[in-house]
Amino acid sequence: MASASLILGLLEGIERPAIGGPMLGSLSDVVFLDVGSNLDCRPSQLLGFGAIGTVFSANIQGKNNPRVGLLNVGTESNKGNKQIKDAYELFEKSSLNFIGNIESVDLFSDKVDVAICDGFIGNILLKYTEGIGYAIINKIGSMVADFLPPELVQKLYKEIADKMNVAEVGGGGPLFGVNGIVIVGHGRSKSDSIANGILLAKRAYDVELTNLIKKAIDTV
């Protein structure tokens, strides 16, 4: 992230870049950010993340008027800490399709398209969902092991695990906010994952994602 920021620079209006992308396994591949690059965020930064996520959801995923939600401990407008309450007011006044606060369970429903949180919460959520996903896969594997051949169980496990791995399926997560296109891949990425990352970068280039983000930040 530091290298990309120094070499490419930041877009005007962006305070700090953020890593984000779709949460695989959610009903509609909800885009959420930040997932770990900014552990503490000002309300204005969260608003910027909302604008960025909306651009990605609309132009890369093809969502129509993406719904944006603030990840919180409850859906009521008076819930949350000062950071979230202040951010809620900014989102309400913005041009985004803001649906209010959401809870983590909403990430696996068709309620929201873009989920916003700081990097502290986002990284914990990312790793928890990855862990619980593998735990469920292992549980299913042990349950069917008595009925299916071991090689078939292993094949089933691998296919499900690969589809749940955002780094493999999507090639990585975009680094939003820098003046260029950067995809952050996993350190253990295989050739297919790297190829998917290149394809994602090409899609971002083709739709002029960087310019769209510039416009979104100016008008949010």
Where are these predicted regions, by residue range?
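Glycine-rich phosphate/diphosphate-binding loop of Rossmann-like nucleotide-binding domains
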Residues: 39-104, 113
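Glycine-rich phosphate/nucleotide-binding loop
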Residues: 4-33, 111-115, 119-220
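A generic short-segment signal for beta-strand/edge and adjacent turn/coil regions
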Residues: 1-4, 36-41, 67-69, 83-85, ...
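Structural alpha-helical scaffold elements that stabilize or flank donor/cofactor-binding regions
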Residues: 107-108
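Short, glycine-rich nucleotide/cofactor-binding loops
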Residues: 37-47, 184-191
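Gly/Ser/Thr-rich loops at beta-strand to alpha-helix junctions
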Residues: 1, 74-78, 189-190
